[in-house]
């Protein structure tokens, strides 16, 4: 009986929170240079968004999603740029560990610049360089 009550409480908590849970956001920016195109390929365990291109200072590419419970929600993106896409990096752009309560309203901003890849968790904070490009 106690086990059944626990399962019911977890189910109610999950569905109740998931209804009110604001989607998480991964935002990708091309801040390379005028005329420079950022090629990217984003995927999760359940979704493959395919290879896309983003022009310099174009509207950011946005991925909106809910965490999967109790599985590990993870998004990876390969960024490529430069002549013949000779610079690249495969980035884990979002990761939420296994949990019973989902994360809600998380933000991950990733910007490609000539000197590397920049990151922020809030809109009102400056982007910080966290990765250098790999030369293929």
Swiss-Prot record:
It comes from Arabidopsis thaliana (Mouse-ear cress). Keywords: Glycoprotein, Secreted, Self-incompatibility, Signal. The keyword Signal applies. Belongs to the plant self-incompatibility (S1) protein family. One of its GO terms (cellular component) is extracellular region. GO terms for biological process: rejection of self pollen. Residues 1-20 form the signal peptide. It is found in: Secreted. It holds the Pfam family Self-incomp_S1. InterPro entries: Self-incomp_S1. This is S-protein homolog 25. Glycans are attached at residues 71, 84.
């Amino acid at each position: 009986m106690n086990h059944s009550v626990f399962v019911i409480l977890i189910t109610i908590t999950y569905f109740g929170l998931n209804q009110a849970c604001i989607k998480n956001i991964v935002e990708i920016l091309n801040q390379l240079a005028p005329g420079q195109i950022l090629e990217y390929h984003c995927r999760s365990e359940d979704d493959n968004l395919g290879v896309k291109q983003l022009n310099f200072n174009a509207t950011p590419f946005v991925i909106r999603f809910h965490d999967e419970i109790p599985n590990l929600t993870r998004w990876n993106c390969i960024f490529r740029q430069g002549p013949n896409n000779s610079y690249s990096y495969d980035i884990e752009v979002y990761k939420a560990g296994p949990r019973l309560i989902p994360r809600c309203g998380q933000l991950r901003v990733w910007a490609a610049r000539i000197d590397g890849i920049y990151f922020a968790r809030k809109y009102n904070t400056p982007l910080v360089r966290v990765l250098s490009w790999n030369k293929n």
